[in-house]
A protein has these predicted regions:
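Solvent-exposed, low-complexity segments and loops of surface/extracellular structural proteins
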Residues: 5-6
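Short acidic, S/G/P-rich loop/turn micro-motifs used as interaction or catalytic elements
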Residues: 10-19, 47-51, 74-76, 99
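Eukaryotic intrinsically disordered and solvent-exposed regulatory patches
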Residues: 25-30, 53-55
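Polybasic, proline/glycine-rich intrinsically disordered low-complexity segments
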Residues: 54-106
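Eukaryote-biased feature marking scaffold/signaling PDZ-domain proteins and nuclear chromatin regulators
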Residues: 35-38, 63
Length: 106
């Protein structure tokens, strides 16, 4: 199993109200310039938020939800501080409820 860290909020907040796209674009460029594999993803309607251990968090976030998930704890901490009004947490995946950490609902 791998520990994934995340921030989550409504899709509208993460994709329209916060400059998240610019932050992620810059990070992708930095990774490319330094030959680092991408270890973060933005997910719309992420299934991992429905895991039983995140049930309370899932119910607090307006739908549709969005999240940035990563194996890099420092990056998610940075995003949490930068975006401020987001939920955050961590989760071991895959687990008995979810095999694909990047799975999304249609």
């Amino acid at each position: 199993m791998t520990t994934y860290y995340f921030i989550a909020a409504s899709q509208k907040f993460l994709t329209k109200e916060e400059p998240l796209e610019e932050i992620l674009k810059e990070r992708r460029r930095n990774y490319k310039d330094n030959n680092i594999n991408i270890d973060f993803w933005i997910l719309i309607k992420p299934q991992f938020l429905k895991c039983s251990e995140l049930k309370d968090l899932y119910n607090k976030i307006p739908t549709p939800q969005a999240a940035v998930i990563s194996t890099d704890k420092k990056f998610i901490t940075f995003l949490k501080l930068r975006c401020e009004f987001v939920a955050h947490g961590e989760l071991e995946l895959p687990n008995s409820e979810l095999s694909d950490p990047l799975a999304v609902d249609e």
